[in-house]
Amino acid sequence: MQIKFWPQDLKLAHTWTIASSVTSGSDVTSVGIVQLTDRDGTVGLGEAAPARRYNESTPGSLDFIAKVDATKLSFDNIEASMKYVESLASGQFAAKSAINVALLDGAARKAGKPIYDLLGLGFRNNHHVTSFSIGIDKADVIRKKVLAAEQYPVLKLKVGAADDKANLAALREAAPQKWVRVDANEGWKTKEHALEMIEWLAQDKFIQYIEQPMPADSNPKDIAWLKARSPLPLFGDESYHTAKDVDHCAECYHGVNVKLCKTGGISNAYEALQVARKAGLKTMIGCMIETSILISAAAHLAELCDYLDIDGNLLTTNDPYLGVTAEKGLLSFASAPEKLGLRVRAK
């Protein structure tokens, strides 16, 4: 097996700001691309989309990948390959995700199947709907963003800043009755303030749920207190990394948001979704700012999800890959350039 890897800068259509970084909005982000090639010429693609929230970076991810001995990786034995990768260092979930996705891409190609069939899940084109994210911004910019996102039936509004009420009002001026999911990104610091904001949001009958209302390291009793009183469902994002977090999240939330960059890849995300479902939690799969490699990888798990928020590639202007599409928010592989593996190809 040979491995190649490189950084890829992604330009954002709008400056991206969320509650955990309200002072440092960005208009460019960087991801790491991984390409594995075996002796038969089978290629597997992967992507690392690290988050500063988890003390990871693209340079750090690529440094980790540089330490991987590709001769110890095999499309024919993903479990052993990942056991080796895990042994190299703790953490580094984004980098491990890139390798896991590339391994599954290659394995599915060799099996003559797309990944969703390799996993036994299948995929229904034009059935799953992704939300489209609106970052924290000035009210007039929010209005313009919402109008530009007219084709998407569901929006996700980032909150947790001083202008939350003005921003929701601006969204509603442009889209009075569109379904909205609200993501506080740990922005409400006390249970009382969080409940006050959620009760205000619940007056809007077209809001579906609230994501990560309080910091993940809050006292679990405070989050459970909030869950018991919240008029809207609560989803844990920063609180749910892997399947090991399920007991805590079952006490504190109604659902969880799984991301490949948090779990360490498709294999662990599959487990995290299955375990959450068995615990009675609603499930969603989310993303960071990513190319179509990682967005498509997440889409292969759609059949395990109640909700999807995989729009990271739609927020960029220079996605270098083609894969799953989201016309009018409906996910589809019907026009994907590849039939096997991730069903992704470079433009």
UniProtKB/Swiss-Prot annotation:
For activity, the cofactor(s) needed are: Mg(2+)
Positions bound to Mg(2+): D183, E211, D237
- CDD domains under this entry? L-Ala-DL-Glu_epimerase
| Annotated residues for binding of substrate | K156, L157, K158, K259, D309, I310, D311
Superkingdom, natural source: Bacteria
What Enzyme Commission number(s) apply to this enzyme? 5.1.1.-
UniProt keyword terms in alphabetical order: Isomerase, Magnesium, Metal-binding
Question: Which free-text remark accompanies the cofactor?
Answer: Binds 1 Mg(2+) ion per subunit.
**A GO molecular-function descriptor:** metal ion binding
Broad EC category? isomerase
SUPFAM superfamilies on file = Enolase C-terminal domain-like (SSF51604), Enolase N-terminal domain-like (SSF54826)
UniProt family annotation: Belongs to the mandelate racemase/muconate lactonizing enzyme family.
* Matches recorded under PANTHER family: D-GALACTONATE DEHYDRATASE-RELATED, ENOLASE SUPERFAMILY MEMBER DDB_G0284701
- Additional notes on this entry: Part of a large, functionally divergent protein family. Protein modeling and substrate docking were used to predict the substrate specificity, prior to biochemical analysis.
Function according to Swiss-Prot or TrEMBL: Dipeptide epimerase with a broad substrate specificity. Catalyzes the epimerization of L-Ala-L-Ala, L-Ala-L-Ser, L-Ala-L-Thr, L-Ala-L-Met, L-Ala-L-Phe, L-Ala-L-Tyr, L-Gly-L-Asp, L-Val-L-Asp, L-Val-L-Glu and L-Val-L-Phe (in vitro). Can also catalyze the epimerization of L-Ala-L-Glu, but with lower efficiency.
Instruction: Please give the name of this protein.
Output: L-Ala-D/L-amino acid epimerase
- What species is this protein from? Pedosphaera parvula (strain Ellin514)
